[in-house]
C-alpha cells in the first residue's frame, strides 16, 4: 500500500490520502504525527511540503513515526522547500516577494506556516539519525505521480519548468 500525507489539492488515486484539513479531498483526516495505521503497513509514504510545517523539535518524531509505518525496504519520499535553492534564487534576483511562501508558508490559517528550513545536508542527517539509508534525490518526472501537480514541482519563476530553478528539495530514503 501507498500513503500520501498532506495531499491538499493533489489527491492521488490508488493511494491512501491523509490530510488534517477536512475541506480537502482525503480518505482519512488525521494529524501526520498520529496516523491510525499499524507498523510496517506501507511500501511507500509520500509527503510533499508537509515536514516544514512541524516545529524543529517535532521533525525527528514525525520521521520516526513515518519510518515505523513503512515495511522493511519501504521508501519515504519527501519534498520540502529547498533552502539552498531559495537563497540562490534570492541572491540572483533580489525578488523577496517570490520566495515568501517558500520560506514562511501560505499563512492563510494557523497550520499553514513553515516552522523550519531544510537543505540536502540537514535533511539527510535527520533521515540517517532515525535509521533511514540509501538517501537520494528523486525526480518528480520519474514517479508514478508525475502527472499530478504538487509542490515537488515548484519552480521560480513560477512554474517555468524549462528555464526556472526547482525550489523543492526532493529526497527519498529506504527503511
Where are these regions (language model features)?
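S-adenosyl-L-methionine-dependent methyltransferase catalytic module, highlighting the catalytic core
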Residues: 58-71, 75-174
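Conserved SAM-binding loop
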Residues: 2-88, 121, 171-175
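Short, flexible coil/turn micro-motifs enriched in small/turn-prone residues
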Residues: 1-3, 100-101
Amino acid at each position: 500500500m501507498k500513503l500520501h500525507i498532506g495531499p491538499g489539492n493533489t489527491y492521488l488515486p490508488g493511494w491512501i490520502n491523509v490530510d488534517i484539513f477536512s475541506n480537502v479531498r482525503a480518505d482519512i483526516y488525521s494529524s501526520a504525527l498520529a496516523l491510525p495505521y499499524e507498523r510496517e503497513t506501507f511500501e511507500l509514504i509520500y509527503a510533499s511540503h508537509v515536514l516544514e510545517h512541524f516545529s524543529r523539535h517535532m521533525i525527528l518524531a514525525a520521521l520516526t513515526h513515518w519510518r515505523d509505518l513503512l515495511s522493511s525496504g519501504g521508501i519515504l519520499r519527501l519534498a520540502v522547500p529547498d533552502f539552498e535553492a531559495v537563497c540562490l534564487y534570492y541572491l540572483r534576483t533580489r525578488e523577496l516577494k517570490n520566495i515568501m511562501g517558500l520560506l514562511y508558508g501560505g499563512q492563510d490559517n494557523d497550520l499553514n506556516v513553515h516552522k523550519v528550513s531544510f537543505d540536502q545536508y540537514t535533511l539527510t542527517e535527520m533521515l540517517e539519525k532515525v535509521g533511514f539509508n540509501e538517501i537520494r534525490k528523486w525526480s518528480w518526472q520519474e514517479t508514478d505521480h508525475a502527472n499530478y501537480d504538487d509542490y515537488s514541482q515548484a519552480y521560480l519563476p513560477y512554474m517555468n519548468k524549462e528555464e526556472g530553478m526547482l525550489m523543492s528539495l526532493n529526497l527519498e530514503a529506504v527503511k
